[in-house]
């Protein structure tokens, strides 16, 4: 990805603390493996994974630490990718007669506070609709490369674009409608809604990549890196690696094939009108006529 020298976003909040990585120990055995799966799933739902703590002030000051040169460059990269998503979504929203409200991206180390509660790095990257912020521990990129063998800067860009995709869903009311529907459904049925949300965020990440390519910042192999990352965090692949078999009813993010397919669809079309991941008859039935999700291009 040709990112150096590109515009950087003003919406980065660096809240990295002075505590070294390793505050959360993940032990061996199936329990530790399950925690690892939850920790490294992209787009984890903060309402499910964060410790709810309404008494925490998300705006309270946090101690900063001097970042290493490597982290400085990683921060610049994240800032450039975020700026690119800002440009793309501002344009798309304007075409729909809307105003795009830019999210903040919080860099943290080990632990952080958000409007959704307290979280550790084990949660992985996440979006909190309560404060419209994306939260990211840069150490996750090392996990993506080493544990999941999904290397490359565009694999990292995909992670950011996916979380920003959740912000787009939030602004359009999709997340709220889905949450309302999930509250009245069984766990298995609610998981189906969660999968559709995540696949749509993958599609939206692909839409961003479509316009990033038009800007000339993609290099040969970048899309393959993003597809590799999408495949690496498919529910089926993670469960197979952890326990040797898969349980489809427990999926919350979609299979590797589904995640790659929806990202590829967004990338090839660049058209948000093609991102209706809720169009299956079963999902429509679960949502109900009164809880149907708005189209991405609805005004």
Where are the language model's segments positioned?
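Catalytic Zn2+-binding segment of zinc metalloproteases
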Residues: 164-179, 210-213
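Structural recognition of the beta-strand scaffold that forms the well-ordered cores
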Residues: 23-27, 106, 134-137, 167, ...
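Pan-zinc metallopeptidase signature
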Residues: 233-299
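Catalytic zinc-binding patch centered on the HExxH motif and its immediate surroundings
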Residues: 111-137
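Long amphipathic alpha-helical segments used for membrane anchoring, targeting, substrate engagement
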Residues: 1-67
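Short pre-active-site segment immediately N-terminal to the catalytic Zn-binding motif
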Residues: 140-158, 189-195
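Short helix/loop segments within enzyme catalytic domains
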Residues: 72, 76-100, 189-192, 196-239
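Active-site recognition of the HExxH zinc-binding catalytic motif
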Residues: 37, 89, 136, 155-171, ...
